Amino acid sequence: MRIAEFAMLLKKFEHINTWNVCDILYDVLAQHYGLETGWLDITSNFNVALFFATCTFDKGKWRPLNKSDTENDEKTKYGMIFHMPSNRMWMRWSMNIDKFSNCRDVKGENGKGENVYELLSHPKFYEKHDNLIYPIGFQPFMRCSMQDGYGIYMRRAQPLQDDIEFQKLRFRHNEELSKRIFEEMDGGKAIYPHEG
């Protein structure tokens, strides 16, 4: 319901109604703007991943992690970055594409006699899909682009910790590292643009 209301709100903006560059992914935009969805945000940019691993959103703004955040117990001392080499991503897609429903169904023809396929707002395939990574692409707002956004549609829990194709890069939290990343990302402004 909240995602539908979010989409209705976005459709009040003129540039949404005149957008003809590509499909608008309302679920993905909702996820990037703080609504809970079935999507897991991921990025192709290591510095963006580091920002989210070393900073926290606290009292309405981003700040670097400090010792009081990371030195509570063994669980909080370490951060984790999940990385999938790019050659594994397309291999995973090629091994799963036949599991999608209606992926080859023609829904009709356009005025030029070309095939028209159903436009999906999210994947129809809800069974085991091995954490497929979807490119978000260009969207009418800049946040997805500035975060080099991709997404995994998590219709059911498939923890990245259990996924053997994701490399797990564990690191020891360090207040100095957190501050440096925070400053390099201009306090988050480098990936959270001012959009009006």
Residues of each region from the PLM?
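Catalytic-core elements of nucleic-acid end-processing and repair enzymes
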Residues: 1-196
